[in-house]
């Protein structure tokens, strides 16, 4: 399912127009992004948790030249599915 299909599905299930469903989805995504930028967790009970984790600096290797390169530390977004969501998917 792509973004357009998700918007259509949201509109049908919520009796919103596609435009309103698109605005709602954009607002949700922006709110999650803003919270993660501040280092906050976003917990949606029954669905899952969005959070950030620190990935340590490490050495990597250029596959073409075999040269060792340093990969800097970075912060990455992570989603952990909740139990109800996992159970529904594994039905």
From Swiss-Prot:
> Which InterPro entries does the UniProt record give?
Hist_DNA-bd (IPR000119), Histone-like_DNA-bd_CS (IPR020816), IHF-like_DNA-bd_dom_sf (IPR010992)
Q: Name one GO biological process term.
A: chromosome condensation
Q: Does the keyword Acetylation apply?
A: no
- Reading the lineage from the top rank, the first entry is Bacteria
Gene3D superfamilies the UniProt entry points to: IHF-like DNA-binding proteins (4.10.520.10)
Please provide the record's keywords in A-Z order: DNA condensation, DNA-binding
Report a single Gene Ontology molecular function.
Answer: structural constituent of chromatin
Main role? Answer: Histone-like DNA-binding protein which is capable of wrapping DNA to stabilize it, and thus to prevent its denaturation under extreme environmental conditions.
Give the family this protein belongs to, as stated in its UniProt record.
Belongs to the bacterial histone-like protein family.
Q: What is this protein called?
A: DNA-binding protein HU
Q: Which organism is it from?
A: Clostridium pasteurianum
